[in-house]
Amino acid sequence: MIKNSFLILILIVFSSFFNIVSAQQTVFNVPSADVTEKGHSFLQQEAQFRGWEPGPFFLGTTFSGYGIGHNTEIDATLFNVGAPATNSITLGTGFKSVMPIAGLKDKYPKREYKFTAGSQVLSSLQSQGVGNWTYSHLSGRLPVTNTRLTAGVSYGTKQVFGTNQAVFMGAIEQPVTKKLNLISDWFSGSEHFSGFLITGISYACPKNKTLYVGYQIPNSSRCGKSGFVLQFGKVF
């Protein structure tokens, strides 16, 4: 009965977003080195879920962004909508800026060397107060394989991350075809959202839609449980 309930919930969430929802705001959870173009909007729905014992769960995150130009977007993210109830539903509002690195942009245009920084005010919707998530990273593509590597740091407070934590974050994106990528990202933390390795694929669908399918592995039992990750995103 529990398994059926989770499957129904997942189908409802994704059927609604796939029909209304290509830039990529995150790899899986690590913010990507892509930014929404000026005048365009981005919407992405993520579901982390596990339908088997022990501990079946559903956890949803909704990402949105609007490009304002100057390599910057304004963002709003709804975190921690889940079953069983998380008691930590939080709205994050802020920005992300993606800057080509001066001196390298013109010399190595195909390497896409970039510096990304962003921050969100985390406003708990369940009486957990107000906090912050701030992050920055460097990224670039390797010759020949065109693999994009990302490495940086993240600091987030208890409203989303369980405790106040500063952690390493990294990602790998490997193009296979023009539409298909192998992707992985990792947060090095020991609590909740800040402590998972997620690996899988992304696929560019028609009409500016992108599908992501992956599997998450927690750094420890305090971070949560293993399970599947699905995302749909769309640029408007």
Language-model features, listed with the residues they occupy:
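Active-site rim beta-loop-alpha module in soluble metabolic enzymes
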Residues: 171
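Positively charged n-region of N-terminal signal peptides that target proteins for export
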Residues: 1-5
